[in-house]
Regions:
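Extracytoplasmic surface signature
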Residues: 1-243
Length: 243
């Protein structure tokens, strides 16, 4: 895989690339940081620390239809840090404890018209979301989910959240990013072990167990993606794999 050395990847505004030469704004943008982006039912969804999008009140989450921004119901009561689409619904995770006026625990889903609490909850902040093997996966600052120990990462199964191989460890085990590479789920963050195996800030899950990616990365990883068939990681680190 390929490593890109970078600072933490936090977006502080919204722009679109109109062509290969120029950037342009999406209306008036937001009044505070944007932490997460995804596409849901043909619209761009943004989540973050903002309470205004394009001059319209929007509590921490908003949608862009190509012309203007609008809120998703009453939004959430605190910042949104992660977004994904699962089973036809938009899933949001973050620091919030209510969504659309409904009490939730750091995660909720939007069905196109309203928020619900059908995903149960986790014990603390959700920093990353993805779908792996047709199951929702959440990572973050939580040691427990549905009152069970999961150690910073869990998958949603019928009836609740489930641990993934014992989760992550180290002096700080938080998972900050989730991605895919080949048939594996990739997790990255503060942790220095995964499933009891040494794994410096990045590890892969094959559906049954965790393993390291080489000697790992020297410090915190905040972002993962793929480009040209390679895994790209960004964060606060200055070396990776001994390089």
């Amino acid at each position: 895989f390929t490593i890109i050395l970078s600072a933490a990847l936090i977006i502080s505004g919204i722009s679109q690339q109109a062509n290969s030469q120029n950037w342009s704004g999406l209306s008036y943008g937001m009044d505070n940081w944007v932490h997460a982006l995804t596409v849901y039912k043909g619209e761009l969804i943004a989540g973050g620390q903002f309470t205004n999008a394009g001059g319209v009140p929007a509590n921490y989450i908003a949608r862009w239809n190509g012309i203007s921004w609008s809120p998703l119901g009453a939004g959430t009561n605190a910042e949104v840090d992660a977004l994904c689409v699962f089973n036809g619904k938009l899933v949001a995770g973050g620091r919030f404890t209510s969504a659309g006026g409904i009490e939730v625990n750091f995660i909720s889903q939007w069905n196109g018209t309203s928020w619900d609490d059908q995903l149960g909850g986790v014990g603390s902040i959700v920093a990353a979301l993805t779908v792996y093997n047709n199951k929702l996966v959440a990572g973050g600052y939580f040691a427990n989910a549905d009152d069970q120990p999961v150690n910073y990462i869990a998958t949603r199964v019928s009836g609740g959240w489930q641990s993934m191989g014992g989760g992550m460890g180290g002096s700080q085990g938080q998972v900050m990013a989730l991605g895919h590479y080949g048939s594996d789920l990739i997790a990255a963050g503060f942790f220095t072990s995964a499933g009891g195996v040494p794994a410096n800030h990045i590890a892969k899950w094959n559906g049954t167990s965790w393993s390291p990616l080489g000697s790992g990365i020297s410090n915190i990883v905040y972002s993962l993606t793929q480009y040209n068939g390679e895994l790209i990681a960004g964060g606060l680190f200055l070396s990776a794999g001994g390089v």
